[in-house]
């Protein structure tokens, strides 16, 4: 099994696309990239800890490759927006691919270069690629949020879905 960590704005919106793929064992919401051990949601939202909201994915590389996960990541995000994603603004919502191995770093960097060269976006691809740091699980009520709170999830992801439809379909 391998581990991947992606930050793409609100973690509520990043779970379902990965969870629906064959070869995914788990997708958990949490916080990473900051300086405070085991932060709370309130602390991260206060924008003082340096953490991003992220998802940790445990996957079977025999069924789905890291490259496929990175490609799926791109189409869930606006890779030209370094200051948050869609409705969610601020450093804690910045887009980041966190790599856990040098091979993951190489795959992510090549994928980013390919996306930039594709001309799909007029602006530069600003998603950062950074080494993985400790991942702290978010509170239980955040786990599987789209299943537990479908109406609130739909409301909180409307602008994201519109962007994805217009730019990735």
UniProtKB/Swiss-Prot annotation:
Q: Cite the InterPro entries for this sequence.
A: Met_Sox_Rdtase_MsrA_dom (IPR002569), Met_Sox_Rdtase_MsrA_sf (IPR036509)
Keyword annotations from UniProtKB, A to Z: Oxidoreductase
Q: Per its UniProt entry, what is the enzyme's top EC class, as one word?
A: oxidoreductase
Which residues act catalytically here?
Answer: 10
List the EC numbers from the record: 1.8.4.11
Which terms does the UniProt entry file under GO BP? protein modification process
Q: Which GO terms describe its molecular function?
A: L-methionine:thioredoxin-disulfide S-oxidoreductase activity; peptide-methionine (S)-S-oxide reductase activity
Under SUPFAM superfamilies, the record lists: Peptide methionine sulfoxide reductase (SSF55068)
Reaction(s) the record says it catalyses = L-methionyl-[protein] + [thioredoxin]-disulfide + H2O = L-methionyl-(S)-S-oxide-[protein] + [thioredoxin]-dithiol; [thioredoxin]-disulfide + L-methionine + H2O = L-methionine (S)-S-oxide + [thioredoxin]-dithiol
Question: What does this chain do?
Answer: Has an important function as a repair enzyme for proteins that have been inactivated by oxidation. Catalyzes the reversible oxidation-reduction of methionine sulfoxide in proteins to methionine.
Q: Which PANTHER family match?
A: PEPTIDE METHIONINE SULFOXIDE REDUCTASE (PTHR43774), PEPTIDE METHIONINE SULFOXIDE REDUCTASE MSRA 2 (PTHR43774:SF1)
Which protein family is it in?
Belongs to the MsrA Met sulfoxide reductase family.
Q: What is this protein called?
A: Peptide methionine sulfoxide reductase MsrA
Q: Which organism is it from?
A: Streptococcus pyogenes serotype M3 (strain ATCC BAA-595 / MGAS315)
């Amino acid at each position: 099994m391998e581990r991947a960590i992606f930050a793409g704005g609100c973690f509520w919106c990043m779970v379902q696309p990965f969870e629906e793929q064959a070869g995914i064992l788990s997708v958990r919401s949490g916080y990473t990239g900051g300086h405070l051990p085991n932060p709370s949601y309130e602390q991260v939202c206060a924008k003082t800890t340096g953490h991003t909201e992220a998802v940790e994915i445990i996957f079977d590389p025999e069924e789905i490759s890291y490259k496929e996960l990175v490609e799926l990541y791109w189409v869930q995000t606006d890779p030209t927006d370094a200051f948050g994603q869609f409705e969610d603004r601020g450093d804690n919502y910045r887009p980041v691919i966190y790599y856990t191995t040098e091979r993951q770093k190489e795959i992510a960097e090549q994928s980013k270069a390919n996306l930039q060269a594709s001309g799909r976006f007029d602006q530069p691809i600003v998603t950062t690629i950074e080494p993985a740091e400790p991942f702290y699980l978010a509170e239980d009520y955040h786990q599987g949020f789209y299943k537990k709170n479908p109406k609130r999830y739909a409301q909180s992801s409307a602008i994201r879905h519109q962007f994805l439809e217009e730019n990735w379909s």
